[in-house]
Each structure stands twice: as structure tokens, then as C-alpha cells.
A protein has these predicted regions:
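Extracellular low-complexity, O-glycosylation-prone Ser/Thr/Pro/Gly-rich "stalks"
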Residues: 2-315
Length: 315
């Protein structure tokens, strides 16, 4: 009886834990990393190798919050020391040991239900740029989210870095560092920091991922009740529409699954310019194309007015 009483807290903790299952569908090995938020205990692992086709489960306790990412183009020696071409956490080891990913990096962010909340909150963020396609799916019918498009193959030249396994797509903030792109200073609130042409391009390709700092209404999802999560790198198909259970974006109507355009995570045309493809486009016009055309129309109108006024001055 005494032994049972000692085991009860352990059994309760196990029942409240969440399982994250990582699957690698990329053509090459990836090295997932984990970073716990401040005040949150670290997980049992902070980084590991995940070969092509492999799956690994990681447990997280109730109330855990943090982020996951995948490093690519890594070279580690037999003692586990080395570096990665993208999303390197700077630890010099397979384990990240409390360090986060260097941008550009695709991030899956979670805050699990705990004493202060009965809901899980989760999102996939491109705010720090993009290095790999990622899909997050929740058990129990809660909504999927992520970015299944290979943005590296369609990244604008001014945002593109690296090549091969080290290729990635920077955010406009990292590339240009200005307050309006980084939502800092006078732009540090939703009213003044608006989506740029670049963040609109990210949003057009991956409509349920964070595209800039204040993209909350369509990018943060919740799940009520116990749920486990699968995180797939380079997902090979777009998930179908499906019903959800108690799963919503934080400021939007209930979602019915997720449409991740572009199919497989390693598809796309080599060397295709994302900006050019959006400008000329195919199918229904996107908000990004409309925005670009609107800006061009305003510029043309302003130029015409200036020439007309100049002509009147000569007369």
C-alpha cells in the first residue's frame, strides 16, 4: 500500500504528459532541437539526430512551453561535436543545452495546458525566417498547422542565404534590420507594424503560419483536452480538410483543418523567384499581388499628376 502511494504522483505526472512525435520525411538527415522557455524545465533531450524515414518521441510535462526546430547540413564527429549549416544552436554538440536556433529557422512553438490554463497553444512561426518545411498535427481532431511548401526554392534573392543543405530564407527583419520590418521602436505595436510585402508573401504560401510579429489572429491555435502532437519535417502531402475538436485560432472562427499549399516539402521549381511568381501569378489573384499592383498604380498616378502640374507651370 505504501509503495502504491509513492507511485501515484509518478503515474499522475505520466498521465498529464504530452508526447511529441518527430518524423523526418526529408531526403537527408535532420537534427531536431528543443528550447524550453524561461522558467520551464528542460526536456529529456535538447537535440538529437533524425535520419531519413526515422521517428522519435519526446515527452513533455504539463505546463511546458518552448519551441522545436530542425537543423540541417550538420557535421558532427564521433564524440558528437560539430556545427550545422542552418538553425545551428551554437552549442557545438548534438544536444543544444539550452540554446536556441540561429535564424533563419522554421519554429514550432507550444505552451501546454497546466495549472493556469486548460488549453494548449501552438503555432508554426516564420518570423525568424525559414529553413525547412514543417507540419504540426494534433491528436483528437484539433487543427493542423505548418508550412509544407519548400520556400527555399522560391525565396527572393535578397532574402536567400546558403545553398544545398545549407539553404534558407531570411525574414525581412534579419535581412534589412529596419524598425518597420522588425516591429521595434515606434513600430512595436499592431497598429503601426503592418505586414510587409515579404511577410505577405510568406502568408500567401503558408496561410496558417506566423508571417510577422503581430500575425496572431490567423496563426495561433488552441486545443482543449489531452492532446499529443506529431511534427513532420518535409511533409510529403497536404493534409485534407477535416473536422476539429475544440480547436481554434485565438481570434478567428473554428478551423476545419489546414490547407498547406504547394504539396510536398521538397517540391517546387528550382530557381523560381517567389516575388516574380506572385507578381505574374496564376489562378485567383492573391492579396499580395493586389497590394503590389495597388502600390504600382498609386506611383503611376502620382507621377502623372506631377508631370501635369509641371506642364501647367511652363504654360
Amino acid at each position: 500500500m505504501a509503495l502504491l502511494l509513492l507511485l501515484l504522483p509518478l503515474l499522475a505526472l505520466q498521465a498529464e504528459s504530452t508526447t511529441f512525435t518527430f518524423t523526418n520525411k526529408c531526403k537527408t538527415t535532420v537534427w531536431p532541437g528543443a528550447l524550453s522557455n524561461s522558467g520551464t524545465a528542460p526536456l529529456g533531450t535538447t537535440g538529437f539526430e533524425l535520419p531519413t524515414g526515422a521517428t522519435r518521441a519526446v515527452q513533455a510535462p504539463a505546463g511546458w512551453s518552448g519551441r522545436f526546430f530542425a537543423r540541417t547540413g550538420c557535421t558532427f564527429d564521433s564524440s558528437g561535436h560539430g556545427t550545422c549549416a542552418t538553425a545551428d544552436c551554437g552549442s557545438g554538440q548534438v544536444e543544444c543545452n539550452g540554446a536556441g536556433a540561429a535564424p533563419p529557422a522554421t519554429l514550432a512553438e507550444f505552451t501546454l495546458a497546466g495549472p493556469s490554463s486548460s488549453q494548449d497553444f501552438y503555432d508554426v512561426s516564420l518570423v525568424d525566417g525559414y529553413n525547412i518545411a514543417m507540419l504540426v498535427e494534433a491528436s483528437g481532431g484539433c487543427a493542423a498547422t505548418g508550412c509544407a511548401v519548400d520556400l527555399n526554392r522560391r525565396c527572393p534573392a535578397e532574402l536567400r542565404v546558403g545553398d544545398g543543405d545549407g539553404q534558407a530564407c531570411r525574414s525581412a527583419c534579419e535581412a534589412f534590420g529596419t524598425p518597420e520590418y522588425c516591429c521595434k521602436g515606434a513600430y512595436a505595436n499592431p497598429g503601426t507594424c503592418r505586414p510587409s510585402v515579404y511577410s505577405q508573401m510568406f502568408k500567401s504560401a503558408c496561410p496558417r503560419s506566423y508571417s510577422y510579429a503581430f500575425d496572431d489572429p490567423t496563426s495561433t491555435f488552441t486545443c482543449t483536452g489531452p492532446a499529443d502532437y506529431s511534427i513532420t519535417f518535409c511533409p510529403d502531402s497536404t493534409p485534407s480538410q477535416k473536422a476539429t475538436r475544440d480547436s481554434t485560432t485565438t481570434s478567428a472562427p473554428k478551423a476545419k483543418g489546414v490547407v498547406l499549399e504547394g504539396g510536398g516539402g521538397e517540391g517546387g521549381s528550382e530557381g523560381e523567384s517567389w516575388l516574380a511568381s506572385l507578381a505574374v501569378g496564376s489562378g485567383a489573384p492573391s492579396r499580395t499581388r493586389v497590394s503590389i499592383l495597388h502600390q504600382a498604380s498609386l506611383t503611376l498616378f502620382s507621377t502623372t499628376v506631377a508631370i501635369f502640374l509641371l506642364f501647367l507651370g511652363f504654360c
